[in-house]
Amino acid sequence: MAHLLEKTRKITSILKRSEEQLQEELPYNDITRQLAEIMDCNACIVNSKGRLLGYFMRYKTNNDRVEAFYQTKMFPDDYIRSANLIYDTEANLPVEHELSIFPVETQSDFPDGLTTIAPIHVSGIRLGSLIIWRNDEKFDNDDLVLVEISSTVVGIQLLNFQREEDEKNIRRRTAVTMAVNTLSYSELRAVSAILGELNGNEGHLTASVIADRIGITRSVIVNALRKLESAGIIESRSLGMKGTYLKVLIPDVFEEIKKRDY
């Protein structure tokens, strides 16, 4: 009991960590590392859309195909759809189970591998799943108590993360709207033409060519780009005779310009 209490305190202490420790790309790597070390297993956290938020591997279990999921930071759609249907913790799933984290081609290497999946709910909202697994040791009752506590702790952190993401999105959209509102009619036409030249969110363009094509002066394009760049919506770099390299930092600008019908 004392050992369980000590582990419980370690898990709940995760809530006291500073938000500055979150990494942008995999914001919960540190949390999964702590959980994996406390429970002596591998662990990962995925949201309800399959995005990998963090993982930590204490033991090698994967092959190149599965490692690719960690590189792309997305889990297969079929797996996530099935995982999202779980409303209570599913413990010690064998390698043959559809929700086993062990890939089919490695089942013979880890015949005793066991997967436990705990849904992450906060205020009735499904935010994702906490997945832990071991090569050959069963998760006992103490482990499952820790899993339930862990999923609650992670849920609180995910809710905070989601709230911060929502606030960031609102700030980004507001910045785009305010910047676009400062553009003149000609500058709006210029921005629309410029965005149409890009290959996705970045590309090379020649201001004089665009200016001639839509019947405006080059200075209009320069002014429009300067306004967007000062608002943090784009970044640009002169390529000399080759034109200008442009990268869109806030993609919401595409939709905002489209709404203006330019």
Curated annotation (Swiss-Prot):
GO terms for biological process, alphabetical: negative regulation of DNA-templated transcription
Subcellular location: Cytoplasm
An MF annotation (GO) of this entry: DNA-binding transcription factor activity
UniProt entry tagged with the keyword Membrane: no
Alphabetized InterPro entries for the sequence: ArsR-like_HTH, CodY, GAF-like_dom_sf, GTP_trans_reg_CodY_C, Transc_reg_CodY_N, WH-like_DNA-bd_sf, WH_DNA-bd_sf
DNA-binding positions: 207-226
GO cellular component: cytoplasm
UniProt keyword Membrane, yes or no: no
Key words, A-Z: Cytoplasm, DNA-binding, Repressor, Transcription, Transcription regulation
Pfam families given in the database record: CodY (PF06018), HTH_CodY (PF08222)
Region called GAF domain, residue ranges: 1-159
Known role: DNA-binding global transcriptional regulator which is involved in the adaptive response to starvation and acts by directly or indirectly controlling the expression of numerous genes in response to nutrient availability. During rapid exponential growth, CodY is highly active and represses genes whose products allow adaptation to nutrient depletion.
Family per record: Belongs to the CodY family.
NCBIfam families: codY_Gpos, PRK04158.1
Protein name: Global transcriptional regulator CodY
Species the sequence originates in: Streptococcus gordonii (strain Challis / ATCC 35105 / BCRC 15272 / CH1 / DL1 / V288)
Lineage: Bacteria, Bacillati, Bacillota, Bacilli, Lactobacillales
Gene: codY
